[in-house]
Design a protein with these regions (language model features):
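Active-site nucleotide/adenylate-binding loops and adjacent lid/helix of ATP-dependent enzymes
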Residues: 1-54, 65-69, 93-106
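Short polybasic/polar patches that bind polyanions
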Residues: 6, 113, 162
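Phosphate-binding core of ATP-grasp and ATP-grasp-like enzymes
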Residues: 41-46, 51-94, 102-142, 148-157, ...
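Non-transmembrane alpha-helical segments in soluble domains
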Residues: 109, 170-173
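ATP-dependent carboxylate-activation loops
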Residues: 150-171
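Peripheral (often C-terminal) accessory segments that flank ATP-dependent C-N-forming ligase machineries
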Residues: 173-197
Length: 197
């Protein structure tokens, strides 16, 4: 791990290879913190180490048909670090974006194409850089973070339903059964935000 830190510098992120959310994820800012991490007993859990990326998280959430085309698209924005919220026991905040930014949509669709995704609900996460980075790019650039072949977790599908005036459970079933939406008209609900511990 010291060789990796010498290459990318501090801070670094360490997280379980098979983790959920930001549980047991750490931002190490010094050699002392790195040594303390290595002295902990994590009961055989394997960790991966990543370079810290300064950014806010945006997601691309979509239902893809059998041709790999989106039949429904939305996303969310997490302006406060989930890792900091978990580790500091702070509140977390995110909101559904009814109309996702063009660059997030383009990145999501490019990932779908690259991975050959068909007939799936996807939840892809991206960083939007909050500052210039030597080799990742300029502030505002979209950088890939995570690929999931499933809906976003927790109550997010219900938030999507509210924010987008839809029923993603029915939309997902429509994709499986008919490869298209058999959309009903739902009353407009407009927006949905989550704030909590």
């Amino acid at each position: 791990s010291l060789a990796f830190v010498e290459k990318v510098g501090y801070p670094v992120i360490v997280k379980p290879d098979n983790g959920v959310g930001a549980t047991t994820t750490y931002k190490l800012k010094s050699e002392d913190e790195l040594r303390a991490f290595h002295e902990e007993d994590f009961h055989g859990v394997q960790f991966i180490m990543e370079e810290f990326v300064p950014g806010e998280i945006y997601s691309y959430d979509a239902i893809m048909n059998s041709k790999g085309e989106p039949i429904f698209e939305t996303g969310n924005h997490t302006p406060i670090s989930i890792m900091d919220s978990v580790n500091n026991h702070d509140d977390s905040v995110f909101y559904i974006e009814k109309h996702i930014a063009d660059d997030v949509r383009a990145a999501g669709r490019a990932a779908v194409k690259s991975f050959g995704v068909k007939s799936r609900f996807v939840h892809f996460e991206f960083f939007r850089l909050t500052e210039d980075h030597d080799y990742l790019g300029k502030k505002g650039k979209i950088i890939g973070l995570e690929v999931n072949y499933r809906p976003s977790g927790g109550f997010t599908p219900d938030m999507i339903n509210y924010a987008c005036s839809t029923d993603v459970y029915k939309d997902w079933a429509d994709m499986v059964a008919f490869d298209r939406l058999t959309k009903e008209e739902y009353p407009d609900k407009y927006y949905c935000v989550s704030a909590g511990c």
